[in-house]
């Protein structure tokens, strides 16, 4: 039995090495790429920001993270990939901000980071160094934290968020409302942006509760001067309802306005 356990352990270790080498090879061959989904300021008919979304070119196909992210996690390569994304985002930022459809004054690009990454101060120092070394404009990069906060670690997370914000990096809480009904999180985590999960958008047409929840979160955002992005908007009726909310810092992301675009297609994007 002990022999079988050791054999299985060796097989698992070998599998991790194979996955890691494959990922490193894909990085070297530039098989990873970024697509950008516009976040729209419908009040001023402009692109407020874009979210960077990782894709992998493989065997003539363009794969979403659903098909390759587990391998990255298994190989313990998430942080390396995040730093690669950040460097590519900074490179692309200087191109995208000059597009005619972009308001370059306060334009930013967001990228996703995990809860484990945002806990790691040494890793965050690497992020800050990359941003500072590239002399990127303050508040041009936003880190989106998926809302899976561990209650006992919120104080440490807020300290790390303060560190990032002090270095000119915006913070967004992504998928807000999924993991918690915990609106107390808005008080404890001082983010710049709240991204409201698609769950609320799906019910906005026919659910009074969804409308009330959004209205309530908007009130909190007004008081704390946070921006809010409503995700997953796919229908005109949803947009029309959102337009009735009286708040200057409300923005929309979803397929109604645009699917994720490569950097060249983004230049020609209009809505």
Question: Where are these predicted regions, by residue range?
Answer:
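Short acidic-capped amphipathic helix/loop micro-motif used as an active-site/signal-coupling element
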Residues: 58-62, 86-90, 175, 254
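EAL-family c-di-GMP phosphodiesterase catalytic domain
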Residues: 1, 11-12, 42, 115-119, ...
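Surface-exposed amphipathic alpha-helices with a cationic face
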Residues: 94-97, 132, 158-166, 215-222, ...
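Catalytic core of bacterial c-di-GMP phosphodiesterases, primarily the EAL and HD-GYP domains
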Residues: 81-156, 232
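Active-site core of bacterial EAL-family cyclic-dinucleotide phosphodiesterase domains
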Residues: 12-71, 173, 258-260
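C-di-GMP signaling machinery
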Residues: 2-33, 72-76, 115-117, 263-271
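Charged helix-capping and loop-helix junction motifs
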Residues: 125-128, 156-159, 208-215
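Catalytic-site-adjacent helices and loops of nucleotide signaling machinery
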Residues: 16, 61-65, 74-75, 82, ...
